[in-house]
Swiss-Prot record:
Keyword terms, alphabetized: Riboflavin biosynthesis, Transferase
Family: Belongs to the DMRL synthase family.
Any one GO molecular function term: 6,7-dimethyl-8-ribityllumazine synthase activity
Function as written in the Swiss-Prot or TrEMBL entry: Catalyzes the formation of 6,7-dimethyl-8-ribityllumazine by condensation of 5-amino-6-(D-ribitylamino)uracil with 3,4-dihydroxy-2-butanone 4-phosphate. This is the penultimate step in the biosynthesis of riboflavin.
Record pathway: Cofactor biosynthesis; riboflavin biosynthesis; riboflavin from 2-hydroxy-3-oxobutyl phosphate and 5-amino-6-(D-ribitylamino)uracil: step 1/2
NCBIfam families: lumazine-synth (TIGR00114)
List of catalytic residues: 94
GO BP terms in the entry: riboflavin biosynthetic process
Residues noted as binding 5-amino-6-(D-ribitylamino)uracil in the record, renumbered to the chain: 28, 62-64, 86-88, 119
Binding-site residues, (2S)-2-hydroxy-3-oxobutyl phosphate: 91-92, 133
One Pfam family this sequence matches: DMRL_synthase
Name listed for the protein in its UniProt record: 6,7-dimethyl-8-ribityllumazine synthase
């Protein structure tokens, strides 16, 4: 769909066929993390990503997710990565540190290694909020990963065609 005349618009799609997706999941707040994972992998399958093309790595907590994502990104095997976990507010400042630093780490890895990363780390005030959000957030991260993987591939092809001209 074109919104502006004479402007090239680059669209992406939600076709996951042929994409390889890496998932890093925190084991802290495991019930919520597993709920996110179930919704995410179900949606990935609906989008056409084959089970054999999905790799899951688990880590102790949200702060460990960026390092595991970095190791997956270095392998150059994945079209997109997904971070899953839950940071639930407690009575201390620790929540803010974990929520902010894990998000910062995801962005840093994605930009440094030129790979889309879908952030499925829930940050909520309590377990009830996390439970209420985990299904939609898990599915959403799958859609974001597939769409951004396709967009990155398209933009990469465009970049190669302009440099070879």
């Amino acid at each position: 769909m074109s919104y502006y005349d004479n402007i090239l618009e680059i669209d992406s799609d939600l076709n996951g066929n042929g994409l390889c997706i890496g998932i890093v999941m925190s084991r802290f707040n495991i019930d919520t993390s597993e709920g996110l994972l179930g919704a995410c992998t179900t949606e990935l399958a609906k989008l056409g990503v084959q089970e054999a093309d999905i790799v899951l790595v688990t880590v102790p907590g949200a702060l460990e997710i960026p390092l595991a994502l970095q190791k997956l990104a270095i392998s150059d095997r994945y079209d997109a990565l997904i971070a899953l976990g839950a940071v639930i507010h407690g009575e201390t400042y620790h929540f803010d540190v974990v929520a902010n630093e894990s998000a910062r780490g995801l962005i840093a890895v994605g930009l440094e290694y030129d790979i889309p990363i879908a952030n499925g780390i829930l940050t909520t005030d309590n377990e009830d909020q996390a439970t209420a959000r985990m299904t939609e957030k898990g599915a959403e991260t799958a859609r974001v990963a597939v769409e951004m993987a396709n967009l990155a591939l398209t933009l990469g092809e465009m970049d190669q065609s302009t440099t070879s001209s």
